């Protein structure tokens, strides 16, 4: 049986670390002038995929 293909959009959005899956923050693409600098700084940092979504993301990535 051939290998499962990974979802290419998921491959571009998620990075797999040692034990967790990292993701970027939303709300950073446009209309940034009204958002405070503190919020923009916080949105810059990477987040981890929530435990309820890990199984679905792993399936998309073919893990």
From Swiss-Prot:
Domain of life assignment = Bacteria
Q: Which UniProt keywords apply?
A: Ribonucleoprotein, Ribosomal protein
Cite a GO CC annotation: cytosolic large ribosomal subunit
Q: Does the keyword Chaperone apply?
A: no
Q: Does the keyword Ribonucleoprotein apply?
A: yes
Q: Which GO terms describe its biological process?
A: translation
MF-aspect GO terms: structural constituent of ribosome
What Pfam families does this protein's entry cite? Ribosomal_L35p
Under the heading PANTHER family, the entry gives: 54S RIBOSOMAL PROTEIN BL35M, LARGE RIBOSOMAL SUBUNIT PROTEIN BL35M
Write out the similarity annotation: Belongs to the bacterial ribosomal protein bL35 family.
Quote the protein name from its UniProt record. Answer: Large ribosomal subunit protein bL35
The protein's organism comes out as Campylobacter jejuni subsp. jejuni serotype O:23/36 (strain 81-176)
């Amino acid at each position: 049986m051939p290998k499962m293909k990974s979802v290419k959009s998921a491959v571009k959005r998620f990075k797999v670390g040692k034990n967790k899956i990292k993701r970027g923050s939303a709300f950073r693409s446009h209309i940034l002038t009204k958002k405070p600098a503190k919020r923009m700084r916080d949105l810059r940092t990477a987040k981890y995929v929530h435990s309820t979504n890990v199984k679905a993301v792993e399936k998309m990535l073919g893990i």
